[in-house]
Amino acid sequence: MKKFHGLILTALVTCLIIPFSLAASAETNENGNNSTPTEEKTTDTTENIITEEKTEPAEPTKDTTVTPPQKSKVQTTIDITDSQEVYSYEQNSKIDLKDFTATLTDYTDTKLTNYRLAANSKLSTAQTGIQEVTLLGDNEDGKTTAVKLNYLVKEKTAQLTITDMNFDLETKIFTGKTKPFASVYMSSPADENFGEGTTTADKDGYFYAEWATTPKQITAYAFDESGNYSEEVTYQVPAKKQNEAVVTAPDKVKKIETKNAVKSATTKPTDVTKVTKDDKTDLPSTGDKGTEWIFVVAGVIVILVAVLLLRKRKK
């Protein structure tokens, strides 16, 4: 019985202790749960705030990066057409893309590579005046940049000259000097002595031409196979020999016929001969008329003689 009462007492004490221990543990759990969520919430809030601050400035930076392409579009064409004397050429002279690209950086302040002609652009010196052309090149970023420029085409100046002109009144040989092996065209005024022809200068540049008659003046200009030429010069042929210079011409000299020389040498003698033949053919008829008059006179004389003889017989 004593053991039984002891067990009951132990059970009662245990029942009294368990509620108090459960209550204490409950308070401890409540305090721990309240502090932990607060820290998590605080941490989460801080992280959200930091994330929002980073994302908001990032959007304006993206907007600012859009502007550089707009600036590059404005600068894709470089116009230097206001410098018309930068490049100049003579008419019909050679022109090449390298003529521009070699020094183009000095005028554009922009280094470009892989130069080429833009569409509908060409290089030509056929027409005089200011010509406009557009070139394309690649910058350091690989983007295409257009360079708009112009060049001046001037009228070609004479490269050859004709000097030492002389006309020998005795031999009628016209001489002068120009570039060796150049061609020389010469002509006289368009009158009765008009003549024209082309001769070639020798290895020393001297040229010779023999005229059929003596013209009043001779106009000449020289040109070569490269397209060079001289100014047109006019030589006034003197009426009398003005110097004692002796012209030593080669054996074969270009002969220039004139209209007057052709007529006097061929047409006129032929006409005279024809007229003479025609006159001779007419002479027989004129001779016949002369012979008739002789017979008439002879008949009159015979009649007079017969009359005289008849009178003598009557006496």
From Swiss-Prot:
Subcellular location: Secreted, Cell wall
One GO location term (cellular component): extracellular region
Short motif LPXTG sorting signal, span: 283-287
Polar residues bias (residue ranges): 66-76
Region (Disordered): 27-76
Coiled coil: none
Matching Pfam families: Gram_pos_anchor
Chain positions with Pentaglycyl murein peptidoglycan amidated threonine modification: T286
Highest taxon in the source lineage: Bacteria
Membrane-protein topology: Peptidoglycan-anchor
Induction behaviour: Present in both exponential and stationary phase (at protein level).
InterPro entries named among the record's database cross-references: LPXTG_anchor
UniProt signal peptide: 1-26
Propeptide: 287-315
Biased composition (Basic and acidic residues): 51-62
Keywords: Cell wall, Peptidoglycan-anchor, Secreted, Signal
Official protein name in the record: Cell wall protein Lmo2714
Organism: Listeria monocytogenes serovar 1/2a (strain ATCC BAA-679 / EGD-e)
